[in-house]
């Protein structure tokens, strides 16, 4: 949803909406990948488990970077 769309629905422009969404999506993806890793491990598929672990690390990094950026932006507003 674009800022214009969100504004027309809620009447409020949220400049941080996309960043908050990104953090939530990244960390949710990292959590979801935990199940995929477990499944691959149980199936004895080390290659797939390793692939999911690498993808999970990237998702966590994105979440961490997004959290840091959001914290810095919110602190500026104080």
Mark where each language-model region is:
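Iron-associated oxidoreductase/ferritin-like identity signal
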Residues: 1-78
């Amino acid at each position: 949803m674009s800022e214009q769309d969100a504004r027309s629905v809620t009447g409020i422009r949220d400049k941080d909406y996309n960043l908050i969404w990104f953090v939530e999506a990244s960390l949710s993806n990292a959590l979801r990948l935990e199940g995929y890793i477990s499944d691959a491990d149980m199936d004895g598929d080390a290659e797939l488990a390793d692939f999911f672990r690498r993808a999970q690390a990237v998702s966590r990094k994105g979440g961490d970077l997004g959290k840091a950026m959001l914290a810095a932006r919110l602190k500026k507003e104080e």
